[in-house]
């Protein structure tokens, strides 16, 4: 399969649908643009060196591709005069390829694929095997040289490693001079790309081939997919038959004639969702007829194109970090993103899971993160890919300031937790007030009608009808809904205002009896340990909670009298 990963990045041309540069360009002053472009370029150069010189992949290939696309976009947005980086500058070896390795155009979407197919004939399709590219040189049928792709013109000598790999024939049936180009891949059993992704298969092969020696067991785990025979027959069918006669069965088994876009989409979907012996990251479209090998160059030609699988991971830019504080005081950082597509979903927000994880990752606006879908539906933060050159200052809430007994009023800094308390109070696990949700509370708070958790109990029609968004009818409907709270039983009210979990404890319908229990008395109840007993005692003794009980007593709510 044509090597369309980092082993040939300098020869890749990204065919993108109408970029609309103006709408995608960041709103940066010149100095910031220069520093951000330089920082991303340096990060990519570090990845390139690690991969090509050390055989270590620090980043998934699809994220690398997206990072390069972003770098190219930024350069075009700001005309930054940083020197163009060569991703293969550390991959060049001493051995010249007898025939250069060409690159491949990457087609971004359905329209690009249809455009490439239009007007062409003698078309074929293959899976785009996720491996590392190699040239195999045979003289009189005997393997004499194996060369890494390098920069497409020169590569490293892999001959000693190739001698150990059983998938590479040491002697061909025909005693002829033969040049083959193909992909060395990590063997997998019934690998389904859509379910398992690339499982770092290509990096395993790259890492082994970067070593001086590999064990027989490691060598046996490497397979070969021959995707071209530069000095073979001009006709594609004849080339495939010849490769099959040489013993390269996979080339014929996985290469099929192609007539139209529908067939291309069908094969792409089939190879994405059905078992294969190797990882893939798309399909290769190629014309059967191509120029003589003497005319090949280490650049993307017109007769080959790649159509990649949907991204399993997307590169997303963080626009803002919001700190969502729940009713119990738990702080959850939520990242606002420049929207990205994953499968058929648009992802614009993602949670870091916890404040501790956010602190560990230290994600700031401008950082580039990796996002995937957990279970194919839920956006998941996989990690930081690169950081903004300028680290944004942020106001970060202190974990010690928020807990089960904080933020009973809409005071500065308490907005998030207080609103979460109200949402819980009116929700299904609280008072279950019909038609009352976060939007209702936000409107009432923003218009100064609610400052404390139970202020809504004293609202009247005259106060509501003058609030924007509350007409005569909606005001009456809201008051009717709020009125139903008075009918709720005592224990429902306890949960609604934030009672900690009580296990199997007895809960008499009397506030004063519960408030009078000591830690030891709580601990004597079923399912109550020392920690929970202390929490329950603290809840009932908290001055803010006691003030709530007095308000409910004044409103003649059952159990609080």
Curated annotation (Swiss-Prot):
Organism: Pseudomonas syringae pv. syringae (strain B728a)
Catalytic residues as annotated in Swiss-Prot or TrEMBL: 128 (n6-amp-lysine intermediate)
Function (record text): Catalyzes the formation of phosphodiester linkages between 5'-phosphoryl and 3'-hydroxyl groups in double-stranded DNA using NAD as a coenzyme and as the energy source for the reaction.
Gene3D superfamilies assigned: 5' to 3' exonuclease, C-terminal subdomain (1.10.150.20), DNA ligase/mRNA capping enzyme (3.30.470.30), Helix hairpin bin (1.10.287.610), Nucleic acid-binding proteins (2.40.50.140)
Pfam families membership: DNA_ligase_aden (PF01653), DNA_ligase_OB (PF03120)
Protein name per its UniProtKB record: DNA ligase B
Record flagged with keyword rRNA processing: no
InterPro entries: DNA_ligase_B (IPR020923), DNA_ligase_CS (IPR033136), DNAligase_adenylation (IPR013839), DNAligase_N (IPR013840), NA-bd_OB-fold (IPR012340), NAD_dep_DNA_ligaseB (IPR050326), NAD_DNA_ligase_OB (IPR004150), RuvA_2-like (IPR010994)
EC numbers, comma separated: 6.5.1.2
Database matches in SUPFAM superfamilies: DNA ligase/mRNA capping enzyme, catalytic domain, Nucleic acid-binding proteins, RuvA domain 2-like
Family according to the record: Belongs to the NAD-dependent DNA ligase family. LigB subfamily.
Reactions catalysed, as given in the entry: NAD(+) + (deoxyribonucleotide)n-3'-hydroxyl + 5'-phospho-(deoxyribonucleotide)m = (deoxyribonucleotide)n+m + AMP + beta-nicotinamide D-nucleotide
Gene Ontology molecular function terms on file: DNA ligase (NAD+) activity
């Amino acid at each position: 399969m044509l090597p369309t990963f980092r082993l040939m990045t300098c020869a890749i041309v990204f065919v993108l649908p109408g970029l609309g540069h103006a709408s995608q360009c960041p709103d940066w002053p010149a100095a910031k643009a220069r520093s951000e472009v330089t920082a991303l370029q340096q990060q990519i150069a570090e990845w390139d060196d690690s991969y090509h010189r050390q055989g270590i992949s620090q980043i998934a290939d699809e994220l690398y591709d997206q990072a390069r696309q972003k770098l190219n976009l930024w350069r075009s947005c700001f005309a930054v005069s940083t020197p163009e980086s060569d991703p293969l500058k550390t991959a060049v070896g001493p051995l010249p390829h007898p025939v250069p390795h060409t690159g491949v155009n990457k087609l971004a979407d359905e329209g690009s694929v249809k455009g490439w197919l239009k007007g062409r004939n003698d078309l074929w399709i293959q899976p785009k095997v996720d491996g590392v590219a190699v040239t195999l040189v045979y003289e009189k049928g005997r393997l004499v040289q194996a060369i890494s792709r390098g920069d497409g013109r020169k590569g490293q000598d892999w001959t000693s490693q190739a001698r150990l790999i059983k998938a590479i024939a040491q002697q061909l049936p025909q005693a002829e001079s033969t040049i083959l180009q193909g992909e060395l891949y990590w063997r997998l059993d019934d690998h389904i790309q859509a379910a398992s992704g690339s499982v770092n298969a290509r990096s395993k092969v790259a890492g082994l081939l970067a070593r001086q020696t590999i064990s027989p067991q490691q060598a046996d785990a490497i397979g070969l997919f021959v995707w071209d025979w530069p000095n073979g027959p001009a006709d594609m069918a004849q080339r495939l038959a010849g490769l099959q006669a040489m013993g390269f069965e996979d080339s014929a088994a996985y290469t099929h004639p192609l007539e139209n876009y529908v067939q291309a989409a069908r094969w792409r979907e089939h190879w994405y969702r059905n078992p294969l012996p190797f990882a893939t990251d798309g399909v290769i479209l190629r014309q059967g007829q191509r120029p003589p090998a003497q005319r090949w160059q280490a650049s993307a030609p017109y007769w080959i194109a790649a159509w990649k699988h949907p991204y399993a991971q997307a590169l997303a830019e963080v626009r803002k970090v919001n700190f969502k504080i729940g009713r119990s005081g738990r702080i959850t950082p939520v990242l606002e993103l420049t929207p990205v597509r994953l499968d058929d979903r648009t992802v614009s927000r993602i949670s870091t899971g916890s404040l501790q994880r956010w602190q560990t990752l230290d994600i700031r606006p401008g950082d580039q993160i990796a996002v995937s879908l957990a279970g194919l539906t839920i956006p998941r933060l996989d990690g930081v890919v690169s950081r903004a050159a300028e680290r944004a200052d942020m106001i970060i809430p202190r974990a010690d300031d928020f807990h089960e007994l904080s933020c009973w009023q809409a005071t500065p800094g308490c907005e998030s937790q207080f609103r979460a308390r109200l949402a819980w109070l009116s929700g299904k696990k609280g008072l279950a007030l019909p038609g009352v949700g976060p939007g209702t509370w936000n409107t009432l708070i923003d218009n100064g009608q609610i400052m404390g958790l139970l202020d809504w109990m004293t609202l009247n029609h005259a106060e509501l009808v003058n609030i924007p968004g509350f007409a005569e009818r909606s005001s009456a409907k809201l008051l009717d809904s709020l009125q139903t709270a008075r009918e709720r039983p005592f224990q429902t009210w306890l949960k609604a205002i934030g009672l900690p979990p009580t296990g199997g404890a007895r809960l008499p319908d009397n506030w004063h009896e519960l408030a009078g229990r000591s830690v030891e008395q709580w601990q004597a109840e079923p399912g109550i340990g020392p920690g929970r007993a202390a929490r329950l005692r603290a809840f009932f003794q908290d001055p803010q909670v006691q003030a709530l009980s007095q308000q409910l007593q004044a409103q003649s709510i059952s159990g609080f009298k």
